[in-house]
Amino acid sequence: VNLHFIALKATKHSDSQIILTAYSRELGRVAFALPAGTGKSAARMRALTMPLSLVECASDPRPGREILPMRQVVQSIPLVELHSDPFKQMIAMFVAEVLAAVLQSGGADEGMYEFLEAAVRILDGADSRQTANFHICFLYNLGRRLGIEPDVSTYTQGSLFDMEDGTWRMTAPLHRRYLGEEASLLAWRLSRMTFANMHRFRFNRMERNAILDGILEYFSIHYVSMRRLHSLDILRSLL
């Protein structure tokens, strides 16, 4: 069976084996066994399966088999800058870590796969202004695909964003998970951000990190905890 997948994370399983977690078009979340070590074939395999690599391979999925073999491994779509530009490398690590947390179970979802593949290609070809906001745009649109997008129809000028309800309201809720007026306006503006216009949104590092914190908290409330992302601190320092 030919599988097309996006590499997410590699974990050392033993001295001779690495487990690659990936998201495939055909099966959804999958795990592959890769050779560890310092040989040419192992090094080539690791290069092909760096975070967010777009890969095609032959495999033999069977009922009850949790870790799949892989052979005839090739890049399905060559990526020019994603693994050579240090900023894009860091964003790729962060996005892959988020996806490994979010895409835990379930079968194939071709719409999700196509969204992810398109996003990876956009990041690979992005200029510096687009790259700076890519992770914010990606997370918002990922939330939309996961069904947790805030109800933007509830926004009115001066309203406050209730993080728990995912709605805007004119009075503060009884809990503390809500945004002030200025941040609530910004949360509404994010709903208008697309990969095509993300370069037009101007934020400094402090603003960008505050937005990122807010989105990750929203994911933690509505989907899965984002409080243990190892790549987050490095990402904050770069963008």
Language model region names:
Residues 1-239:
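Non-catalytic alpha-helical scaffolds and adjoining flexible linkers that form interface surfaces
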